[in-house]
């Protein structure tokens, strides 16, 4: 039985060392970036969001070291910048937490939090969430997973933030490199009650649910063969490697300029130019 309260990938969290510099970099890559959000003192972090439909990316940075952000800081220390967490959409976080508990995964949370949001008309509102996490030690492919219930969608999916010069529309795949892709994919599939799917080049996909993006586990060598001519410098041997984004490829090519590499029928930003995250723009 698939999880009833978890319905596929909601957003990808890219952990960065300098939050404001990362936001400027993503603006140069043709993304519309939200105003900076600041989380609670307990969380000690801040973020910028890059909104698609029905999902998004989050650039996350530590503003003040706290106990809560210790795992994120440890990730940066060990891996450098890159995809540190993937969020699923939670219909009801309290019920979702009980669902994973029943499957042998003691949940962290649910936890309620919010951050102020400056709306396009200049007024200040709040984005409110209720999240729960699978146990921190359960990190398939080295990436933690959690689920996020949006209590105020209207302060997150703001129409003005959803139009991008690079033509980005939605997440299609989350690419995860690992020496043993099949084992990592099986681990994730068990955690979210999904089936794995073998791909022609030996990679293993795990659908995240509904019409949302798939996870694709593959070796670094397989990733290099999928995207010839794209430098994979800076990627860890095991961890989040990149995002495949459905987009208007011509718009992406124009917006990216010299940062983009034509490969695999689309245009690709190498990890070194994407804050540790490869961005592959493909036809929507």
PLM feature spans:
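Glyoxalase I/VOC metalloenzyme domain signal
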Residues: 2-9, 14-34, 52-112, 119-284
